């Protein structure tokens, strides 16, 4: 019985652990999902954005007490505008998905929503981390040696 409880706890901890992508693994995944050049945004820009928003962590979340919204996933997509977390007042849900979908190891939903974000007039400038850490910088380091 004790062994079953321990096994259950181990399995539970594995299920809730985040996938933190290796740099080149994420670069290849984003390229495969059509991010390189999407709306004129290079793969290196997406990689820099993901690095500074989440550290390549699929399960990253950050609560914003000012407007009571939360940023979700590898791109830190906000619940005020883009997804539904069931608790953000006045949420728009422009990506038409649950915020939990942005926390999955399979980042296809997160990529689709990020593509929706950049179709708005702000484009990639919607992300503060991109403006502060990536804009007008040499970003080759984010894809260097990845074969993409």
Curated annotation (Swiss-Prot):
Listed GO CC annotations: extracellular region
Pfam families xrefs: Lys
Disulfide-bonded cysteines: 24-146, 48-134, 83-99, 95-113
EC number(s) stated in the UniProt entry for this protein: 3.2.1.17
Catalytic reaction list: Hydrolysis of (1->4)-beta-linkages between N-acetylmuramic acid and N-acetyl-D-glucosamine residues in a peptidoglycan and between N-acetyl-D-glucosamine residues in chitodextrins
Catalytic residues identified in the record: 53, 71
Residues annotated as signal peptide: 1-18
Keywords noted in UniProt: Antimicrobial, Bacteriolytic enzyme, Disulfide bond, Glycosidase, Hydrolase, Secreted, Signal
Gene3D superfamilies: 1.10.530.10
GO biological-process terms attached to the record: defense response to Gram-negative bacterium; defense response to Gram-positive bacterium; killing of cells of another organism
Domain named C-type lysozyme: residues: 19-148
Keyword flag Hydrolase: yes
InterPro entries given in the database record: Glyco_hydro_22, Glyco_hydro_22_CS, Glyco_hydro_22_lys, Lysozyme-like_dom_sf
MF terms in GO: lysozyme activity
Subcellular localization(s) per the UniProt record: Secreted
Its job: Lysozymes have primarily a bacteriolytic function; those in tissues and body fluids are associated with the monocyte-macrophage system and enhance the activity of immunoagents.
Note: Lysozyme C is capable of both hydrolysis and transglycosylation; it also shows a slight esterase activity. It acts rapidly on both peptide-substituted and unsubstituted peptidoglycan, and slowly on chitin oligosaccharides.
Family: Belongs to the glycosyl hydrolase 22 family.
Protein name, as recorded: Lysozyme C
Name of the coding gene: LYZ
């Amino acid at each position: 019985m004790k062994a079953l409880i321990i096994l259950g706890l181990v399995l539970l901890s594995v299920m809730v652990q985040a996938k933190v992508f290796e740099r080149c693994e994420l670069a290849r995944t984003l390229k495969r999902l059509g991010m390189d050049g999407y709306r004129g945004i290079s793969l290196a820009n997406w990689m820099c954005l993901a690095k500074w928003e989440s550290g390549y962590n699929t399960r990253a979340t950050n609560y914003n007490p000012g407007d009571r919204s939360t940023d979700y996933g590898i791109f830190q997509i906000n619940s005020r505008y883009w997804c539904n977390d069931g608790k953000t007042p006045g949420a728009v849900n422009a990506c038409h998905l649950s915020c939990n979908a942005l926390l999955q190891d399979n980042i296809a939903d997160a990529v689709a929503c990020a593509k929706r974000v950049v179709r708005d007039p702000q484009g990639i400038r919607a992300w503060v981390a991109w403006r502060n850490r990536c804009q007008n910088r040499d970003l080759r380091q984010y894809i260097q040696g990845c074969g993409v």
